[in-house]
Every structure is written in C-alpha cells, then in structure tokens.
Swiss-Prot record:
The cysteine framework is XXII (C-C-C-C-C-C-C-C). Belongs to the teretoxin C (TC) superfamily. Expressed by the venom duct. Keywords: Disulfide bond, Secreted, Signal, Toxin. The keyword Disulfide bond applies. GO terms for molecular function: toxin activity. It is found in: Secreted. Contains 4 disulfide bonds. This is Teretoxin Tan22.13. Residues 1-21 form the signal peptide. It comes from Terebra anilis. Residues 22-24 form a propeptide.
Length: 91
C-alpha cells in the first residue's frame, strides 16, 4: 500500500512539474525514497532490482528519469521540461 501511494505521488509530482522548469533536487528526493522503498538487491550479474516486485516499475521510472535529467541539466542544475518529455518518450 505504501509503495502504491508513493508511486501515485511521484506521478502527480512529475505531471505538475513537466509543464515548467524543474529543480533536479525535487525529483531526486522522490526517487531516493522510491529506491529506499524498493529494498534494492543485486542479482548474480550485478544488476539492481527491487526485492518487492510491486516496486519494480517505480524503480525503473525513477532510474530512467534521473538518467534523462542528467542529460538535460543546464549550468544552474535546472532541468527543462521539454527535454525530459522528449527523452522519456524515446526511451
């Protein structure tokens, strides 16, 4: 239940933020919570995944968003929504 609420909160936050310039730290905070709640473990090959399978989609979403935001940062560590939207839609 806690995971579902967290995922819903993330989706609302991202939806609200995609229409404007975002601060990277806000999304990082949300995704750090996501990663913590997933109870990450590594498989034999060193790949990370969530021990709780219900959390795996949230973890993938956060991982993809953080990767996308790294590619879209400007000199002030701000991320532009258009770049995030474009890269998320192609991944």
């Amino acid at each position: 239940m806690k995971v579902q609420i967290l995922f819903a909160l993330m989706m609302v936050l991202v939806t609200l933020c995609l229409g404007q310039k975002m601060q990277r730290g806000v999304i990082e905070d949300v995704c750090n919570n996501c990663e913590t709640n997933c109870q990450l473990i590594k498989d034999y090959y060193g790949r990370s995944f969530c021990q709780d399978s219900l959390c795996q989609d949230s973890y993938r979403f956060c991982t993809n968003l953080e990767f996308t935001m790294d590619k879209c940062k400007d000199e002030n560590s701000n991320t532009h929504a258009g770049c995030v939207t474009a890269l998320l839609s192609t991944s």
